[in-house]
Design a protein with these regions (language model features):
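Key DNA-contact positions within bacterial/archaeal DNA-binding proteins
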Residues: 40
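Beta-hairpin "wing" of winged helix-turn-helix
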Residues: 54-68
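Short, hydrophobic-biased segments on the C-terminal half of alpha helices
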Residues: 46-47
Length: 134
């Protein structure tokens, strides 16, 4: 399992906005330039994050992008899943009937535990904590 480049860009964009605070708007061109994100990629990412309720967008001369919630209320998991969908290490975790291993296989609980730990870590990590770490 690998977090996609698009999800990585989304995390960087939200982190950029979190550093600005919830009231300040950022032009998407500024976010793209400062975070080295291709503008066409960023437009799609912002749309997905807006649909997920993580960002507010506004058009026009005074438009831009802002966080929809306080950085402490946005988890890393929410951003990644808004872009990549639910975290799934492999087909043996979460999808009944699609695993090549027998249900009694000793590897299945290892995959399940690893996924639970990853999801838990991403869920417990919020953007306020990340910007505080610098």
């Amino acid at each position: 399992m690998q977090i996609t480049r698009q999800a990585d860009y989304a995390v960087r964009a939200v982190l950029h906005l979190a550093r600005m605070g919830t009231r300040d708007r950022a032009a998407t061109s500024t976010v793209a330039k400062e975070q080295n994100i291709p503008p066409s990629f960023l437009a799609k990412i912002i749309s997905q994050l807006s649909i997920a309720g993580l960002l507010h967008t506004s058009r026009g001369a005074r438009g831009g992008v802002t966080l929809a919630r306080d950085p402490k209320d946005i988890s890393l998991l929410e951003v990644v899943e808004a872009i990549d969908g639910p975290i799934q290490l492999n087909e043996c975790v979460g999808n009944e009937g699609t695993c090549a291993f027998d249900e009694s296989s000793p590897i299945k609980p290892v995959w399940s535990d690893a996924q639970e730990e990853l999801v838990s870590r991403l869920k417990s990590t919020n953007f306020a904590d990340m910007i505080a770490q610098k």
